[in-house]
Amino acid sequence: MPQPSRPRKGSLGFGPRKRSTSETPRFNSWPSDDGQPGVQGFAGYKAGMTHVVLVNDEPNSPREGMEETVPVTVIETPPMRAVALRAYEDTPYGQRPLTEVWTDEFHSELDRTLDVPEDHDPDAAEEQIRDAHEAGDLGDLRLITHTVPDAVPSVPKKKPDVMETRVGGGSVSDRLDHALDIVEDGGEHAMNDIFRAGEYADVAGVTKGKGTQGPVKRWGVQKRKGKHARQGWRRRIGNLGPWNPSRVRSTVPQQGQTGYHQRTELNKRLIDIGEGDEPTVDGGFVNYGEVDGPYTLVKGSVPGPDKRLVRFRPAVRPNDQPRLDPEVRYVSNESNQG
């Protein structure tokens, strides 16, 4: 006898399953304003995976103090640049952009991505922001930052990836002064200025694109069995729904776009933040090459293929107290090509 009921196949929490509008991921929420003012995000390029041997530092664990092997993703994270401070104001309809304070030092390739302002008065823009702060209408403060692909030889692109990164922590006036200092000093900031090894971070990326796929691969429905499969349609669904309502519901698993979706994974532990070629495997990472600059080792996997942009954010819902500076005793350099 067939099973009378079961949970539906595939999650509806990720719909609509369509292509991401941009390869640069976006964050819709940010951590709380605790601690000192600072930038709440960074970005890098995914190189590949390897494994490390580290000492288990989880309190009360049966394996505490023992060595264990952990898979890690290697992400190349050269310094980023902040070219402007964008201030938001609180309105009855939510936060709206108020004004921007731009730097006068721009990367030579930045005009490939955005129009660099020529006639800009940063003093007038700063005064407008401070007036909004005194009136109590100042909302979020965000830096317009961009990557520097020139610093990553393995990524064959010249066009910088531009994104907004929130400035959090401390009071509003402290955040404003901190953001203005970053912009005035040239805007360069590094991964270890924001994160520390052992902390938890949320990682966002655009997954591998797989094109149009059928309902079996896209939703995980069962293939037809027995005489139902002998009709010649083993990988199709049985029907599109009932007679009434006389329409096809959006919950019916059908073929369509698979992959190339933005996904955010929470609470990924940062195993190591360093610089050099230590994590590079023999022969280089497949489809990437060698890592010979600032890098970050993230525990586990990260969305997206090699060379794709990955964004970091301090964990918004940390499920554990950070255990800083894990003891890494070995980083595998075994070739991924056998």
Swiss-Prot record:
Indicate whether Phosphoprotein appears among the record's keywords.
no
Gene Ontology CC, one term: cytosolic large ribosomal subunit
Question: Region Disordered: what ranges?
Answer: 1-44, 151-170, 206-259, 312-338
Q: Where is the composition biased (Basic residues)?
A: 220-237
How the protein assembles, per its UniProt entry? Part of the 50S ribosomal subunit. Forms a cluster with proteins L14 and L24e. Interacts weakly with protein L13.
The record, for NCBIfam families, names: L3_arch (TIGR03626), PRK04231.1 (NF003261)
Please identify the protein, giving its name as recorded.
Large ribosomal subunit protein uL3
Supply the source organism for this entry. Answer: Haloarcula marismortui (strain ATCC 43049 / DSM 3752 / JCM 8966 / VKM B-1809)
Gene that encodes the chain: rpl3
